[in-house]
Amino acid sequence: MKSLQTLCEISLMRNHSNIQSVSNVPYHLLKRILQKVKIPQLLKLEKSNVLLIFDDDELWLEFLRQDFPTNVHEQFVSKRDIICKYYFDFVKENDIELYHSNQDLLKSCVRQSVVKDIRNNKYRIPYRMLYSKYQQEVEKKQEESAERLRLEMQKLQQEREKKQTIVVDHTVYFKKRNTKKTTRLHNEPHSQLYMKSLKDHESRLKHFKDGGFNIAKRHAQRVAFGGQAGGQSSSPKKGPLSIKPEPVKVNRQMDNVTAEKKDVTQPITPVKKRRSESPSIFLNRKKPALFRPTPKTNAAGSRPHTTAITNDHRTTSHPYPHKDVVTSISSVTANPVTKGHKKKKSGIFVRNAGSDGDSFPHVTATGPTTRPYIYEPRK
């Protein structure tokens, strides 16, 4: 059978969120219950029983590991008074009666909690104090970031206000406006750029004796054609022709209309003269005489009709055994020769050909013309 203490602990653990005060209860009885509570509730229970802060250091170590895992969990100080002052201030703030009545009890509790570490000969900072220190640093960083954000938003708002359009009352603007024409006073100082341009202008006037360029005067002098080039024509201006309206007669119909049209003078248009200059020399160039090779065709194909065989013909043997080919070529060529090109014939095909095969010196007007003839026996 379980003891009464165990049953009470089980009941309190089941309802740990409803615990409001643990005054005058020692820590060893509340250890299992306090392990279930969270930080806000633990702070509230510590205020109801101030002596718990001397014993619940292990609970704050767990909270420190959970909330600040990357931070250092153990820190040391060389002065003991800092830690003692922290404990006494907490007791004085939450239970002032105990602070004044039981000083000996408080000193004994502090003596047991604040112990020098043998390894570095310093005093370890309590985990509750270290947790509050880290928490204050985080809150301070959050406040600084919030302040920076607030300043940035203020700057943006000021820039928007500067660029914002403002509606102006036109009546007030026209009342304040000075209608008199304001002029610059002579004794008022001018800008450096204005003074520099003024000095340059004065030096330019000294350099040119005529006093500088005057746009009203026409300085350009015409030299070509006696000074008349580019100007107006010297011929007298012809005034507009005055046309006297003639009274319209009803009796005349078409004849009067045509006569009136002839009487009306048409506006004089300038006569277009042809350019007297010679055209460019590049336009007189003739097309180059290119040599065009004539296709070599069989004489039999170009002359389908045949002529009679005479004694003047030369007979040649044909490579085919069943056909006797007789060719006769006249001293005058049948194909026309293009202008500028001299066509030569081989001496074996021309009667009385020269040594170089040219037949033109031996051609006569009365000479007989001969053509190639192919003899094909009947089948």
Curated annotation (Swiss-Prot):
Q: Which residues carry this modification: Phosphoserine?
A: S235, S278
What keywords were assigned to this record?
Phosphoprotein
**Region of interest called Disordered, as start-end residue ranges on this chain:** 225-248, 260-279, 291-379
- Biased region (Polar residues) positions are 295-310, 327-336
Q: Spans of biased composition, class Low complexity?
A: 231-240
Every copy of the F-box domain together lies at 19-63
Basic and acidic residues bias located where?
311-325
- Pfam families from the entry? Elongin_A (PF06881)
Any single biological process term in GO: ubiquitin-dependent protein catabolic process
The UniProt annotation puts the region (Interacts with DEF1) at: 351-379
Keyword Phosphoprotein assigned to the entry: answer is yes
Q: Where is this region: ELC1-binding?
A: 1-143
Q: What else is known?
A: Present with 815 molecules/cell in log phase SD medium.
Quaternary structure annotation from Swiss-Prot or TrEMBL: Heterodimer with ELC1. Component of a CRL3 E3 ubiquitin ligase complex consisting of the cullin CUL3, the linker protein ELC1, the substrate receptor ELA1, and the RING protein HRT1. Interacts with the large RNA polymerase II subunit RPO21 in a DEF1-dependent manner. Interacts (via C-terminus) with DEF1 (via CUE domain); the interaction is direct.
Which family, according to the similarity comment? Belongs to the ELA1 family.
What protein am I looking at?
Answer: Elongin-A
Organism expressing this protein natively: Saccharomyces cerevisiae (strain ATCC 204508 / S288c)
